[in-house]
Amino acid sequence: MKTAKIYQYQLPMDSGVILRDQRLQQRDGLIIELSDGKHTAKGEIAPLPEFSQENLEQAREDLISLTQAWLNDEVLDVDANCPSVAFGFSMALLELENNLPEVGNYQVAPLCSGDPDDLVVKLNEMSGKKVAKIKVGMYEAIRDGMVANMFLELIPDLSLRLDANRGWTPKKAEQFANYVSPQYRSRIEFLEEPCHRPEESLEFSKATGIAIAWDETVRDEGFEVKAQDGVAAIVIKPTLVGSVGKCIELVEQAHLLGMQAVISSSIESSLALTQLARLAAWKTPNTIPGLDTIDLFKMQLDTPWPHCELPMQALSDLEVIWES
């Protein structure tokens, strides 16, 4: 007999977590728990403020409706729901059917969100390929260029991933590039969405030789993966994109064109983050995923992230807001 529960969580965040225009003091989300009588599986639904098209209340309504359809054995169109619900519910179904491999890729590209000196220490301790991520576009473009150049100069075997979140005008993007030595530019794996408009980002790549990646563009209406000069990767954030099936389609399309596909976090709890690590190991085994976000939290949820010492919130401690 099928049963389902929906939990709601609030997890405290590190004080330094800033989204586009606001400080994120706590992460709010829902956990769906599905049981088929033999097995139980979970998925996380956590719209990200300022990035998701839906809010938590809209997600809750979609989730209850979809869960009722599942309990009634109706034919499900998971992607007809808002993206965070499509992702979390499809992940729970994948787990329930035992189709998500247990092995995870927990190697991360460390995120430089504070003192650059801290990142240098962290990178020097890394074995294997050294890849780091830096958020750019929040300060002056010239400063961002100088910081990127400094890392590439200090650590000769370092590759950088940069994320501008469409933050620059073409002029600002040019200022950034002017402060990155041409000899180091090939070690920028990609710069996510440097300019406000995709065509401006393509022009930037053509002019500078710096590879770019699509992130926000992946979620634009009618997006298709296609080979374009200068585009090295697509960044897939399942909470913002939709179902696991939809994400896998994007990965396969990118790989067919010789592009990287990077599974990336939308600041989910450790529960979903570990599932994303398993998805990454399964579908993008040769690419380091973008999952270095657990340290933005003050607490884990239900499932531990390897080597993380943050305290754990048990699912049994959460409020059940719906069950059947």
Curated annotation (Swiss-Prot):
SUPFAM superfamilies: Enolase C-terminal domain-like, Enolase N-terminal domain-like. Its EC number is 4.2.1.113. Mg(2+) binds at residues 163, 192, 215. It catalyses: (1R,6R)-6-hydroxy-2-succinyl-cyclohexa-2,4-diene-1-carboxylate = 2-succinylbenzoate + H2O. SMART domains: MR_MLE. Pfam families: MenC_N, MR_MLE_C. Its cofactor is a divalent metal cation. CDD domains: OSBS. It comes from the Bacteria. The active site is at residues 135, 237. Keywords: Lyase, Magnesium, Menaquinone biosynthesis, Metal-binding. GO terms for molecular function: magnesium ion binding; O-succinylbenzoate synthase activity. GO terms for biological process: menaquinone biosynthetic process. Belongs to the mandelate racemase/muconate lactonizing enzyme family. MenC type 1 subfamily. Converts 2-succinyl-6-hydroxy-2,4-cyclohexadiene-1-carboxylate (SHCHC) to 2-succinylbenzoate (OSB). PANTHER family: O-SUCCINYLBENZOATE SYNTHASE, O-SUCCINYLBENZOATE SYNTHASE-RELATED. HAMAP family: MenC_1 (MF_00470). This is o-succinylbenzoate synthase. It comes from Aliivibrio salmonicida (strain LFI1238) (Vibrio salmonicida (strain LFI1238)). The gene is menC.
